[in-house]
């Protein structure tokens, strides 16, 4: 509940312009809070079984690990914002923490996708990652130039065209506000009022 209230307050203040922050910070905060709530809401036990049994000990620990990875990766972006903005992409070497949090967030996102959308989308994402890592081995036009693991993690985690791209940008601004407004209308029964008003007008 505390995370949900914090997310609502943060999104409303940033989307309305009451709190002006760089888009990267807004997106990182959005992803960190949403993933943390998701791992609390959809425990690994319920995600793995249609008929949940008592959760094994590792289930709770795995959830905590995923929350730590999600929150830690987002916090790293926020606290090291100046460093990320000043570094030269694909020229400056990545630090050990860059690699650690980047890889951790990728794993957390894949696990969150599995819990919400199932294995199909995870398999598609996994194939895309495998292509990025090993696509240089494919012949002809199917292949691409060699990309080091550091380059892939950098592109996904430290640049604006990876995880923090336009899709998350839309989610962190327009989409979230619409979902919040829709949920508010539903819980306050205002949706039926608007529906009846529309029927009267037409």
Question: Where in this protein do the model-derived segments appear?
Answer:
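Conserved, well-structured core domains of diverse proteins
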Residues: 1-93, 99-103
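C-terminal ends of transmembrane helices
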Residues: 39-52, 109-114, 187-188, 192
């Amino acid at each position: 509940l505390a995370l949900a209230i914090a997310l609502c307050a943060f999104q409303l203040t940033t989307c309305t312009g009451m709190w002006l922050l760089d888009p990267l910070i807004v997106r990182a905060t959005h992803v960190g809070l949403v993933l943390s709530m998701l791992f609390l809401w959809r425990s690994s036990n319920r995600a793995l079984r249609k008929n949940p049994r008592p959760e094994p000990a590792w289930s709770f620990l795995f959830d905590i690990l995923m929350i730590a990875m999600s929150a830690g990766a987002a916090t790293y972006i926020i606290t090291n914002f100046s460093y990320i903005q000043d570094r030269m992409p694909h020229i400056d070497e990545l630090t050990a923490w860059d690699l650690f949090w980047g890889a951790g967030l990728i794993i957390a996102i894949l696990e969150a996708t599995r819990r919400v959308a199932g294995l199909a989308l995870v398999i598609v994402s996994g194939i895309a990652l495998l292509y990025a890592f090993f696509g240089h081995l494919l012949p002809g036009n199917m292949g691409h130039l060699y990309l080091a693991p550091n380059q892939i993690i950098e592109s996904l985690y430290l640049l604006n065209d990876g995880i923090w791209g336009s899709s998350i940008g839309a989610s962190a601004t327009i989409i979230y506000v619409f979902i919040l407004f829709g949920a508010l209308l539903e819980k306050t029964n205002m949706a039926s009022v608007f529906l009846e008003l529309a029927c009267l007008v037409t």
